[in-house]
Amino acid sequence: MDLEKLKDYQKHIRNFSIVAHVDHGKSTIADRILELTDTVSKRQLKNQMLDDMPLERQRGITIKMNSVQVKYHANDGEDYIFHLIDTPGHVDFSYEVSRSLAACEGAVLVVDASQGVQAQTLSNTYLALENDLEILPVLNKIDLPSADPDMAKSEIGDMLGLDASDAVEVSGKTGAGIPELLERIVTDISAPTGDLTKPLKALIFDSKYDDYRGVVMSVRIEEGTVKPGDEIMIMNTGKKYEVTEVGVSSPHPVKEDILIAGDVGYITANIKSVRETRVGDTITSAENPTAEALPGYRQIPPMVYSGMYPTDNRDYDDLKEALQKLQLNDASLEFEPETSQALGFGFRCGFLGLLHMDVVQERLEQEFDLDLIMTAPSVDYHAIMPTGEVKLIDNPADLPDAGEYKELQEPYVKAEIMVPNDFVGAVMQLCEGKRGEFQTMDYLDKYRVNVIYEMPLAEIIYDFFDQLKSSTKGYASLDYEIIGYKATNLVKIDILLNKEPIDALSFIAHREEARDRAVQMCSLLKKLIPRQNFQVDIQGAIGSKIISRATIKPYRKDVTWKIHTGDPDRRAKLLEKQKRGKKRMKSVGRVEVPQDAFMAVLRMNDDDINGK
């Protein structure tokens, strides 16, 4: 292909992401676009076409961003190439949204016409503006009886500062308005401007391992061109490879002769390990490298930590390998080996939130056939030592004794909660109960308020979201960001089973709530741990002080059933023998603790603690 033809082809490329609050219908709109442009035949089309991970289809959510090339014949008679990137809407996966926006020139901002602007709509709009993207507002679900397009348009104008007077009105369900949306993508989103004559510069935004082709890198070409046979270099490692195949996803892989600046596609180069291709790295030409790498992605620190252990210690190496494979295309997952007296060898893993943790656990169990025990999640604390050294504590069991550190700090977040006026009181009551500090309140319109609190991350990660939804009948939406660490009065609570501390059950709580939480934990464990042949004493302790206890009574085996009546000596002898046996069993017998018990801390909601 000559340069002029390639430049003309580039003018017809449109790269855009579909962003929205969770459940506003991004994936459904993506399905309709694929259907209308005949990218996928009606026979092959299924709901959530781009959500190709089984777990995504099972849960009905988008977890990983996905790109697809769509060919569109526009009303001006020209053929256009769309690269559509579908993104997650859940706050845990906002890093996936920021990654996908870096590969685009425009964003289709989907707003549910019946619900209007929600918390994630706001944060995704800010992400798009940070990336200097053209934003195209779209109102979805206009076929619903409760849809109010005028209300949604005025909210987009007032709250986001975008002109929504001519926002496209569509229905992802019926396909109404999708043709107009496709035309607006052509006219409103600009073509990529990368220089084709410069050295190759491409951003890796995802990578996965294929048994036949090695590592498949999903890339956005910023400058230059790449074709099979070219020698490329990954700038971060300096390693060089020969390109074996380039292509696009449509939505299944389609080989191409060349990828040019502006294209979103894939490259394979016989790379054996995904660790050599970190997400956010820059690919360039080995012979004529570009001067500087692309900015890549900021590393998102984990918000939540949890211990992950195989139920059978022989699976340790399999778990390590599985985590390494997952980490390759989930850059936000962190893990390091750890040992627990109760659970043996495992890993301390860092996640972006509880949904992310659930998803990783389910993927490991489904895709790698592993049986896992997860310990209760915790945040990372800062213990300030007398020397001034800051010790990071991501596992409550590692917290030094109270006298050994000067103060303990925990991460705080700024939480923005959008809520209808009627529920403001309930939201404020909930936040105050979670140690929240009120900051401000913005009235967005006659009906809705944005309530802003600063509160400990530890209070949000457990069941805050569920409680928020139930106290506002599902109308509230939440967005939060870490703002730093604050010193608070925290203590570590150890749980002892038969006087043995179980490190995996330790947790950190505010001193004022410590006793209530310890009592709650003991009574929960009493329900969850099955009865044994010996008595199990459950105790909660701060240091050496026991603050709560519960007892699981043993099974009583009737050892006297075969004695004839009237032989009290024989009876007493057998009961004494049973007692001795139980005593021995108690000293050697390990209490069997089920998985539910390790997650019990999640179920200690405040109503239970307050005895309601």
Curated annotation (Swiss-Prot):
InterPro entries in alphabetical order = EF-4, EFG_II, EFG_III/V, EFG_V-like, EFTu-like_2, LepA_C_sf, LepA_CTD, LepA_IV
Mainly localized where?
membrane
Q: What class of enzyme is it?
A: hydrolase
Q: Where does GTP bind?
A: 23-28, 140-143
Q: Where is the tr-type G domain?
A: 11-193
Its keywords, alphabetically, are: Cell membrane, GTP-binding, Hydrolase, Membrane, Nucleotide-binding, Protein biosynthesis
User: Among the entry's GO cellular component annotations, what is one?
Assistant: plasma membrane
Which SUPFAM superfamilies does the UniProt entry name for this protein? Answer: EF-G C-terminal domain-like, P-loop containing nucleoside triphosphate hydrolases, Translation proteins
Q: Which GO terms describe its biological process?
A: positive regulation of translation
Report the catalytic activity. Answer: GTP + H2O = GDP + phosphate + H(+)
Any keyword Protein transport? no
Membrane topology category: Peripheral membrane protein
| Top-level taxon of origin | Bacteria
CDD domains assigned to the protein according to its UniProt record, in alphabetical order: EF4_II (cd03699), EF4_III (cd16260), LepA (cd01890), lepA_C (cd03709)
Q: Where in the cell is it found?
A: Cell membrane
Using the record for this protein, list the coiled-coil segments as residue ranges, or answer none: none
**Transferase: present as a keyword of the record?**
no
Give this protein's Gene Ontology molecular function annotations: GTP binding; GTPase activity; ribosome binding; translation elongation factor activity
EC number(s): the record gives: 3.6.5.n1
The function of this protein is: Required for accurate and efficient protein synthesis under certain stress conditions. May act as a fidelity factor of the translation reaction, by catalyzing a one-codon backward translocation of tRNAs on improperly translocated ribosomes. Back-translocation proceeds from a post-translocation (POST) complex to a pre-translocation (PRE) complex, thus giving elongation factor G a second chance to translocate the tRNAs correctly. Binds to ribosomes in a GTP-dependent manner.
Family, as annotated:
Belongs to the TRAFAC class translation factor GTPase superfamily. Classic translation factor GTPase family. LepA subfamily.
- Name of this protein: Elongation factor 4
Which organism's genome codes for this protein? Lactobacillus delbrueckii subsp. bulgaricus (strain ATCC 11842 / DSM 20081 / BCRC 10696 / JCM 1002 / NBRC 13953 / NCIMB 11778 / NCTC 12712 / WDCM 00102 / Lb 14)
